[in-house]
């Protein structure tokens, strides 16, 4: 069961349950393994997704989307993408990503 988070949240936060994030997080958001996040709001920081996690970004991340080997799809906006494991981040045609930084 997915929980909804809304409003203004002071981060950093670690997501340990399947979550739909609608609000604004000031700070980094870390998604743990085996957890799914649907991001419709904004992260004013980095979105860090651990191996085995799932993140679907419809909203915006002002910092980097850092993928440690998770299933990550960006259809919104991100400052940058860093793929640090497989599979690589999927970036849809409508997404806006300022830069991609693969090691």
Task: Give the ranges of each region predicted by the language model.
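Extended beta-solenoid/beta-helix repeat architectures
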Residues: 1-103
């Amino acid at each position: 069961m997915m929980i909804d988070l809304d409003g203004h949240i002071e981060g950093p936060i670690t997501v340990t349950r399947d979550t739909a994030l609608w609000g604004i997080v000031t700070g980094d958001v870390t998604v743990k393994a085996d957890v799914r996040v649907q991001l419709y709001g904004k992260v004013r920081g980095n979105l860090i997704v651990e191996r085995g996690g799932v993140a679907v970004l419809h909203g915006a991340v002002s910092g980097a989307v850092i993928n440690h080997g998770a299933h990550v799809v960006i259809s919104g906006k991100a400052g940058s993408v860093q793929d640090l494991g497989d599979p690589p981040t999927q970036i849809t045609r409508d997404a806006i990503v300022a830069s991609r930084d693969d090691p």
